[in-house]
Amino acid sequence: TDYTDTPLVEKGQNEATELGKTWTELKNIEIVYVSPLTRTLQTATNIFKNSGKKFVAIDELMEYPQGVHFCNKRKNKSELIKLFPHVDFSLIQEKSQYWNDTVFESVDDLKQRIQLFKDYVKETKQNNISVVAHSSFLKQFLYDELGDVHQGLCHCYPYDYKL
């Protein structure tokens, strides 16, 4: 079985659809930034279904760690464009610049990805954005810590964060 860029499980699809129906602040979101892994693209699509929001894929939002674990290796850009035609993939390259088949990225590498994303968002001057990413990435992004990714971090839940 090929575990490269694994899809979202049914439970995750249902959670995302439910959040899209119940999240009252969804209407205030200006743009949706999403990790270009299939499972997060599916999550974002289910949350923001029929909302008319713009989706932008950004490699910096991919799961930690990049490298070795093929479930975290994204498909090529050309394949993603075919699967998710409603997503803007212009900010990513054909192959991920962060992937390495034999070496895990370090926590410092992750922190650098997070800072690059924060700098990008500051430059765009948008006020209300959505970031659809992964638990390990989000825990480091929100709380500057890793560890037990389920402690205090819910799946498919909106967190407020101010840059």
Q: Model segments located where?
A:
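Alpha-helical structural signal in soluble globular domains
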Residues: 22, 43-50, 79, 83, ...
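Glycine-rich phosphate-binding loop signature in dinucleotide/nucleotide-binding domains
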Residues: 25-28, 121-127
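Phosphate-handling substructures
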Residues: 1-7, 51-113
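Beta-strand elements within well-structured catalytic alpha/beta cores of enzymes
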Residues: 33, 127-137
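Catalytic metal-binding/acid-base residues of hydrolase active sites
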Residues: 38, 61-62, 136
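Domain-level recognition of soluble alpha/beta enzyme cores
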Residues: 145-163
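A short, acidic, amphipathic alpha-helical segment used as a generic capping/interface helix at domain edges
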Residues: 109-124
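Active-site-proximal alpha-helix that buttresses catalytic centers in soluble enzyme cores
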Residues: 1-55, 155
